[in-house]
Each structure stands twice: as structure tokens, then as C-alpha cells.
Amino acid sequence: MKYMTVTDLNNAGATVIGTIKGGEWFLGTPHKDILSKPGFYFLVSKLDGRPFSNPCVSARFYVGNQRSKQGFSAVLSHIRQRRSQLARTIANNNVPYTVFYLPASKMKPLTTGFGKGQLALAFTRNHHSEYQTLEEMNRMLADNFKFVLQAY
């Protein structure tokens, strides 16, 4: 099993939405409409811009549809409150993390289509079942990749 990298995220179509440090936005806060989108949010440390740099993904979080529309802001609140070992690590290590967003509709290359060529990927099923959950996709990510700060 390999570590997920920025290249994997870029190939799937992820977008950078900002940078956090200690559970707070660093260098500007994205608009609430961006932060409330359901999907997956990936944290990457040391995104330094070197041409051959391909840092590993430190952690992943998913956000479903919420009536409150808190989205990723709720994740940041959990980090600031240090509600888990992962949250305590991110809150206390003084490391800036670049936040990538990927909607569930673009998860196929990282889940059911992982490790397949372009032709095979075209014939791999999409995630569109009414019973397909973000939790299930999260487990598929854990089956296919390792993350620096997460064991599962």
C-alpha cells in the first residue's frame, strides 16, 4: 500500500481551497459556500512549490449534507477543541496544511478505479447508488492508501 500524494489528488481533480494552521485559516478564509460543500477534504503539509516535490497527504476528512451547512468548519472546530489524537496533533504541531477539496462525484480514481489504467477506469462503476455512503468511500480510501497522520 502506498501513501496518497498530491499527484493522486490532482489526477482525481481536487482543488486547493486554502491553508490551515492549528485549526485556523492561515492566509485568508475561504467563503462559507466552499466550506459547506459535501465531499472529502485532504490535508497536505509541506506543499513548497518545488518542481519535483510530491508531498504525501497527512489526513483526510469527509463532510456530508448538513442542515447547519457547517461543513469543513465543523472539522476545524473539532481540531481546535482537540477532540481526538489526530485533532490534538494538527492543533499543536504548528505545521501549515494545504487543504484540498474533492467532491464525492470525483472519487472514482481513488476508490473503485484505483490502480487501473485509463481504459479500465472508463468501465469502472461510479459511486451513484442511493445507498453509497461517504463512510464507505472513506473505507475504500483506507484500503487503497496510507495517510501520514491516520492509521485507518
Swiss-Prot record:
Q: Name one GO molecular function term.
A: DNA binding
Keywords assigned by UniProt? DNA-binding, Host-virus interaction, Inhibition of host DNA replication by virus, Modulation of host cell cycle by virus
UniProt xrefs under InterPro entries: Phage_Ndd
Domain of life of the source: Viruses
What the entry lists under Pfam families is as follows: Phage_T4_Ndd
> One biological-process term from Gene Ontology?
symbiont-mediated perturbation of host cell cycle progression
- Role of this protein: Disorganizes the host nucleoid and inhibits replication, but without host DNA cleavage or degradation. Only the architecture of the nucleoid is affected. May act on the host chromosomal sequences that determine the structure of the nucleoid. Binds to dsDNA but not to ssDNA.
| Name of the protein | Nucleoid disruption protein
**Name of the gene:** ndd
